[in-house]
Amino acid sequence: MKLIIAEKPSVAKSIASTLGVKSGADGSFQGNGYIVSWCVGHLVSPMDAAGYNENFKKWRYDDLPILPEPFRYVIAPGKEAAFENLRTLMNRPDVDTVVNACDAGREGELIFRLVYEMTGCKKPIERLWISSMEDSAIREGMNDLRPGAEYDALYQSALCRQKADWLVGINATRLFSVLYHRTLNVGRVQTPTLAMLAEREAKTMMFRKEKYHHVRLKVNGAEAVSEKIISPEDAEKVKAACTDRSAVCVSVKREQKKEQPPKLYDLTTLQREANRIFGYTAKQTLDYAQSLYEKKLLTYPRTDSRYLTSDMAETASCVIHLAAKVPPFDKCSSFYPLVELMVSDKDVTDHHAIIPTMETEKADISALPVGERNLFLLVCCRLLCASAEPFHYETVTATFECGGHTFTAKGKHILSEGWREIERIFRSSLKDKPEDEDGGADLPELMEGETYDNVSAEITEHYTQPPKPFTEDTLLSAMENAGKADMPDEAERKGLGTPATRAAIIEKLVSAGFVERKGKNLIPTKAGMNLVTVLPEPLTSPMLTAEWEQRLTSIARGEADPGEFLNGICAMVKDTVSTYSHISEEGQKLFAPDKEVIGNCPRCGKPVYEGKSNFACSDRSCSFVLWKNDRFWTSRKKELTKKMAADLLKKGRTAVKGMWSEKKGDTYDATVVMEDTGGRFINFKLEFPKRKDGANGRK
């Protein structure tokens, strides 16, 4: 009997249904020669540092670096029952083979293998590797199960990725948190990503806008524009030289161009487009795509390929015709799909591009949740566009001379919309339409050598623009292309992270307080900027991290040694710990909490801040401090408040009501006067208001 282990219950249910396994028991489906169960994500995770040594519970510099050998693993908290269920099923005597049906990728391989290793199972492994949850794909995959050993290198790559993240994360986070007395989460991939955001923000902050001008002529219904003019006086001179004068068209250049159809989506380009059009975060897009995959409507989403394999051509043609019937695409002109444009076997590694499935024919798309529906239609749109004719257009550039100056008018004339018609119809169906990026309009008929009299001229003011903040669209692009210029063209993987992990990296930066969302923009916080400032270059370098990602890909292909990779990570960690044993006073100030000034120190004049238990001088060499739990206050059942401390610092006294007298068993009001003798502790004395004279002359 085969035991099939999926990554989550919904996938297990689909596999069981396809294989005719009807009977459901606790934690599995059984029947027809199969047991189908699931992992519920990561059931096994690396042990925390404290698991290796009780002393590691406290974060101390002297314990670093922490380099486990060997790495040990534990069952993820709260998932003990799920793990025990799989252990029991693996140990059943009637189970002779275990099928890994977790997601067909690096992380899915890791999820299964760690469970398999921890249970101590020695039974043969087979691999179900599919790119769609359609019944036909599952049946085909089950008929072509691969030996588990074929994916050993992929597992080693996944282990190296996990260990590298642990080594860098645990050591660098502890190191810089101890040095700066604040939890500073440092990650192998998230920190270089933060560095890119910080660099962009720094350029924006340093930017100083500059004014410039254009002179614009109205010529026979066309607008011709001068070159950039810095000086307003010069712009006025150009305007004066042209107003009511004649302009001569000295050249008209026409050029026919074509824009090829866009490629199909991989996960990163899908996330970018969904962010640009719908404002979805990378995580939202991945979640929607994963749900559509599990509903059998989209193919496997965590792919980095934008092509299909040649054996998919017939299926793709069928899916294209189905997608063309889905509103609003049913309004598009009919066309003969060019499937060959989307096929390239050499450009497909683990999984092909994301496309709809044959289930499109039976599905009620209108019943999908709005986020999933939008994403599904976006993928349909891209499939249709990718198989359509090119977009043909003509550009026109007309050059004029007037008053001794040159002006240019540009226009565009559409010859054949091709794939752009499909995109236009889809965009027009959206309630929130994105900005039109085409630019350029038809120019009136213009002839070289023709003179146009009495032209009008006007000056327009413009300002240079700062670098635009990153959006998830542009950040995903930057992550994907990090280090690209420094890697050989044949390198299969470039960039920070993988399509499957980039969304989580962005979310970690936001949840850690290093990045915040402002509309569509991602802006580093003050803490994020400061963190990048204090970290060493190996931890913030996008290029170095991209090289590591390339090494991991080489390990997955059996072309690099896992041990060498981890030795390099360990060496970098050791070097970082030894180099950063202390920090400057200026560095300490970067992460000092924002404090309110209560007053000025009576001894040295420096600001006094409120702490958890006191009000202390900001100058460490000055010993002035007012303790909130001073016995003077606690014996009178009062606490030194911020207002009272401010009065003492400003006036040397504060009025206090309701102080307790142990002797009389009652409360009283008095003025507390501060007597600072310059010692370690501050003394106080009480002053009582004088009573008015009574009738008998006594006070």
Give each language-model segment a name.
Residues M1-Q162, W166, P337, P466:
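Intrinsically disordered, low-complexity regulatory segments
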